[in-house]
A protein has these predicted regions:
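Patatin-like phospholipase
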Residues: 1-70, 80-317
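Gly/Ala-rich beta-loop-alpha elbow adjacent to hydrolase catalytic centers
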Residues: 71, 75
Length: 317
């Protein structure tokens, strides 16, 4: 019997944002009057799930037809690889940083548990392609520490400037050391305000946004446990600017983002018709944000890839 092959679904079978992207790929043109954005959730090494989804989109020839790619926190790094058309290099970076040089809880109290310096050293061995002609724009989200405002850094067109902006977006309060300087201002992790880049792309002119999730659609941060809350508040009280307030508000903010996306998935709520998310089914094993385990990262990449292929393709004999 002939083996089954995969083909892209008919756009009429897809949510509007995915349908618009598939139609562009079919036409080999962006001249449709739409402005299509991809938003990549971060979450430390949990971004492996979104990486797998992006690999599938690239494999299907879709990412080159986006107008802009946004990322938050570790999603900003993945966004750089996706925008440049080298998501496979991003996958290898995630595998290569699964070492104690990157995440080491034995450093608690002495130095940052997470070494962004080590991560960027690994990235420089496989640098993302920034600013290539014909590729989507790259934009990343970060929080300005002194006033707690979420800002878009970009479009980013130069390699070292892009890595500096990505470092700012990935500056995880408490875990990765102090907030970082970018173009004369101090920034921290964009995920404090917008973990899943959707609202900002829409505000900046996107007609549709495709959100790649690092966690399943039902995931919620909920209320922090008492012991965790006490420890985090103790450390956060020493942080500059608005960081303490933002850390305290983050669980509720994240959960509202997730609820809005869940509604959009069924075409309702404020994002209905304009936003579609790709997210693993509830119960899919997820990578913890500081879980530097190569096997878990590979499994999450494979799971994310399967999610995207399942959503966008059909098997035919």
């Amino acid at each position: 019997m002939p083996s089954a092959v995969s083909s892209l679904r008919d756009p009429d079978e897809l949510p509007a944002p995915l349908a618009a992207l598939v139609r562009r790929a079919d036409a080999c043109s962006r001249a449709d009057g739409e402005h299509l954005a991809l938003g990549i959730e971060g979450g430390g090494l949990a971004v492996a799930m979104a990486c797998g989804m992006a690999l599938a989109l690239e494999q299907l020839g879709l990412t080159q037809w986006l107008d802009v790619v946004y990322g938050t926190s570790s999603g900003s790094l993945m966004a750089a690889y996706v925008a440049g058309g080298a998501t496979g290099d991003g996958e290898r970076v995630l595998e290569d940083v699964c070492t104690r040089e990157f995440v080491d809880f034995r450093r608690i109290g002495r130095s940052p548990v997470v070494s962004i310096d080590h991560l960027l050293a690994v990235v420089r061995r496989r640098p993302p392609r920034i600013g290539d002609a014909g590729r989507p724009q790259l934009r990343v989200l970060a929080v300005r520490v002194d006033d707690g405002r979420l800002l878009t850094l970009g479009p980013l067109t130069e390699a070292e400037d892009a890595l500096a902006a990505i470092r700012a977006s990935m500056a995880i309060p408490v875990w990765s050391g102090p907030a970082v300087a970018y173009r004369g201002e101090i920034y921290s992790d964009g995920g404090l305000i917008e973990s899943i880049p959707v609202r900002t792309p829409l505000a900046e002119g996107a007609s549709h946004v495709i959100a790649l999730r690092s966690r399943d659609g039902a995931y919620r941060k909920g209320r922090r446990g008492r012991a965790y809350r006490t420890a985090e508040n103790l450390v956060a009280s020493r942080l500059p600017g608005e960081l303490r307030r933002l850390i305290g508000e983050r669980p509720a903010r994240y959960d509202q983002e997730a609820r809005n996306l869940e509604s959009a998935t069924v075409g309702t709520g404020p994002l209905g018709g304009r936003v579609a998310q790709l997210a693993p089914p509830t119960g899919t094993p997820l990578v913890g944000r500081l879980q530097a385990d190569r096997d878990h990262v590979r499994a999450a990449v494979a799971a994310g890839r399967a999610v995207a292929l399942g959503a966008l393709t059909r098997r035919t004999a």
